Amino acid sequence: MKPIVKYQGGKTKELKRIVPLLPEYTRMVEPFAGGAAVAFNQEKDMWLNDINTSLINLYRVVASDMYYDLQGAIAPLYSMEHDDLSREFYEARDVINNSCVDGVLWAKSYIVVRQLCYSGMERYNSSGAFNVPFGHYKKFACYLSQGHHDLLSGATVTLSSAVDVINDSVEGDFLFIDPPYMDR
C-alpha cells in the first residue's frame, strides 16, 4: 500500500532495497513517520509518530469513522481542473495556516496542500505559516483507501518526541528510524 500523501524524504522509491533487509518483527515503529512508506508497505501492526500536527491529525482521522467523511470531502477534487485545483490549494493552505479545529476539514486541507504543492515541498516561513505555492498540477491524485483506514484503525498514532517513542518501544518492535534532514 502506498503512502496517503507525498512527503519529502519518503522511502517509496527505496522500498525494493529496504524491504529485503527488514527482520522479523511484531510491530513496525516509525518515530519519524512522515509519509510512513515502509510501514504502509508492510501492512502489519504499526506505531506511527511524528511532531507534525497536521500529519498526525490526518492519520487519526483516517483511523476513525471520520475517514468516510474525509473520503467524501476529497472526492470532488478528482474531477477538478487546474484553475479549480489552484483555488482549492490556496483555500486549503489558509486552513492549515489558521489552526483549524475541524479534524476532517484539517485532514482534507493537509491532503490538498501535500498533493498539490510545488515539488512536494514542506516549508514554513518565520511566522510558522506553510508558504509553498501551488504546483500547477492538472489533476488531483491521492492514494487514500479503505486499506489505510483498516490498517490505521488498529495502529498506535502519536504526536510525541521520537526519544519518548524509542524509549517506550518493547520487545518485538522494529524501529525504522529515518530522521528528517533539517540542515539541507
Locations of regions flagged by a protein language model:
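SAM-dependent nucleic-acid methyltransferase catalytic core
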Residues: 1-13, 21, 66-184
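Conserved S-adenosyl-L-methionine
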Residues: 10, 21-80
